[in-house]
């Protein structure tokens, strides 16, 4: 299954001018069968999907609940949580990475760095946590290897 793991939608993020229905249509045209909504520090985009579209439209397309979490010491981290798990704490930025990893794993979620080699202040490899303990990378479940908003040498 081909899934876009890092999606911002206008219903939940100022980082997007594309609504979720248009996004799904574009992804389908490019051969994707799913997406993870990962708006910054909010589940509002996913909530919109769940309330207005889930089970009504695009039933052949998988939409997963995610968030792009802004850590205190490790840049942006993509977090994917199971459908039934409610964690409002993830909508409050600033948790240290080690605590975030423990919290997500204890509640059945997975996580990994977003654009890990990209922008200086938002990327894991430029963050304090990586320099202090690079072995923490072993605790990630995945690593984003391509981000269309980053320059070629960052991917």
Sequence positions of predicted segments:
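A metal-dependent hydrolase metal-coordination microenvironment
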Residues: 1-106, 150-155
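Conserved beta-strand positions in the central sheet of alpha/beta enzyme cores
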Residues: 36-37, 112-113, 144
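Distinct, well-ordered alpha-helical segments
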Residues: 49-51, 76, 119-136, 155
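Short, structured patches in soluble enzyme cores that scaffold and shape functional sites
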Residues: 81, 113-115, 147
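Internal catalytic-core helix/loop-beta-alpha segment
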Residues: 93-128
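Catalytic pocket-lining loop regions of alpha/beta-barrel enzymes
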Residues: 109-110, 128-149
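Short acidic, S/G/P-rich loop/turn micro-motifs used as interaction or catalytic elements
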Residues: 118-119, 148-151
